[in-house]
């Protein structure tokens, strides 16, 4: 618990240094690895804005979702912030960020009207409808399609991961709602 509090406090300090463009007010110059902030001892990397745990992503999602004008900010890999209320979509070890407003199109979870599934277009409303139906036919169809070669999650999904877990969690949450 204490380590988490320290990381949250550090994230708050870093947040204060971030400008609206998502880059630190003190711009890093080309540095060698000695000056790169190392991940926490357990390998986790936290969002510099909100302190949420980052998800490592490769070039596929970055190329797909980041506007060309800012794509060079995160050339090889980055971390994705899944916190829906955070303004940061992607960030790197230098705390350079790509903001949600700098993405090519609206994406879930930042925009609930955007598809949860980037490959097949399943939306929050589809999951909500399935939670009220006798059988979750849309979700079953998505599960079937997600195992097919048509699924391109590593490139199309905002986090580079299959959405099935997110869809199942949302379904369970909505099923319990009155």
Model-based region annotation:
Residues 1-30:
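N-terminal amphipathic/basic-hydrophobic helices that include classical n-h-c signal peptides
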Residues 46, 51-73:
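Short recognition patches in nucleic-acid-associated and regulatory proteins
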Residues 61-71, 96-109, 132-137, 170-175:
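Short cysteine/histidine-rich metal-coordination sites, predominantly Zn2+-binding motifs
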Residues 147-178:
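Long, compositionally biased
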Residues 75-99:
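Short metal-binding segments enriched for Cys and/or His
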Residues 55-56, 86-91, 122-124, 158:
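Short functional micro-motifs and their immediate structural scaffolds
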Residues 34-42, 70-75, 108-111:
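Short, flexible, mixed-charge glycine/proline-rich loop motifs
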Residues 47-50, 81-83, 117:
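Short cysteine-rich clusters marking metal-coordination/redox-active sites
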């Amino acid at each position: 618990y204490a380590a988490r509090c320290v990381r949250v406090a550090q994230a708050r300090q870093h947040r204060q240094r971030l400008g609206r463009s998502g880059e630190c007010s003190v711009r890093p110059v080309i540095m060698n690895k000695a000056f790169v902030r190392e991940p926490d001892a357990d390998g986790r990397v936290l969002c510099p804005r909100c302190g949420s745990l980052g998800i490592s992503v490769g070039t596929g999602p970055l190329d797909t979702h980041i506007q060309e004008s800012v794509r060079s900010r995160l050339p090889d890999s980055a971390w994705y912030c899944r916190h829906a209320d955070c303004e940061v979509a992607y960030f790197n070890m230098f705390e350079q960020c790509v903001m949600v407003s700098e993405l090519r199109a609206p994406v879930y979870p930042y925009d609930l009207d955007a598809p949860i599934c980037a490959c097949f277009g399943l939306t929050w409303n589809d999951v909500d409808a399935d939670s009220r139906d006798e059988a979750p036919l849309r979700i079953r169809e998505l599960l079937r399609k997600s195992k097919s070669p048509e699924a391109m999650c590593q490139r199309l999904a905002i986090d580079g991961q299959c959405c099935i877990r997110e869809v199942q969690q949302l379904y369970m949450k909505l099923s319990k709602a009155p």
